[in-house]
Amino acid sequence: MDSKITKYFLIIFLINFKVLAVEFQGKFIQGHYIIGKTSPGAKILIDKKKVKVSKDGYFAFGIGKDRKFDIVITENEKKIIKKIQKRKYKIQRIDGLPEKKVTPPEEFYERIKKENLLIGKAREIESDLPFFKEKFIIPVDDAIITGVYGSQRILNGIPKWPHYGLDFAQKTGTPIKAMNNGIVTLAENDLFYTGATLIFDHGHGVSTLYMHMNKIFVKVGDHVKKGEIVGTVGSSGRATGPHLDIRLNWFGERLDPQSILAN
């Protein structure tokens, strides 16, 4: 009789333990995007920072491009420590750019500063939208990937910031699809570096950027559906040819877009 009671309580404990255990989707690699699943109502901290948890227990976070130390996830009072796998990034050389777009003249500094603030504001939005946990799709059909995340860019022989996006080369005018459901939080036709640019909010601090477009078909506040045509491929801003440069952000953390397409 005692053994049956013991077995009963052991089963109950294991069931509860499974419910409380955090599950992760994604790889703990530099630059990657992670989706977590916990019990509804649980409190989650990422490196002591509280993150939003959806009503059904989902949350999201990102791992920085050059992060070298472990990441600490706290579920209620339980700590989970994950080691981060390092990556080796490529070197990419791009020649033939107009000199003013490699090293912009001083008269453009104020404009660039204002545009960076505009983009930064859109990236810091923390909404309750649930789309961050859904599958993302490739935005351009039959494209060639010509630039990857993390590559060190040497522009006209001058070392510059790493590339934080994923480039899809296609003909000017090729349709661009929304990678996921979301709300348009930025729609600008002529930013200095990125040209015609869109930002979509997918919820919980997760946003995607579309850059160097030719035409934009949506406006700020529009609700877009996954697969909807939102514009066309172009070469606006600082670009040497027609392509779409996509970015993935978790708030201010710039992540590898391939990590959401892989998920």
Question: Residue ranges of each PLM-predicted region?
Answer:
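Sec-dependent signal peptide recognition
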Residues: 2-12, 18
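Cationic-aromatic interfacial patches
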Residues: 21-90
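Solvent-exposed coil/turn segments that connect beta secondary-structure elements
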Residues: 39-41, 49, 66, 85-87, ...
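Envelope-exposed proteins and targeting segments
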Residues: 40, 69, 78, 141, ...
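Surface-exposed, glycine-biased beta-strand/turn segments
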Residues: 83-194
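Short, well-structured beta-strand-loop connectors
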Residues: 175-186, 218-233
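Zn2+-dependent peptidoglycan hydrolase active-site motif and core
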Residues: 179-214, 242, 247-248
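Extended, charge-rich intrinsically disordered regulatory tails
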Residues: 222-224, 228-240, 246-263
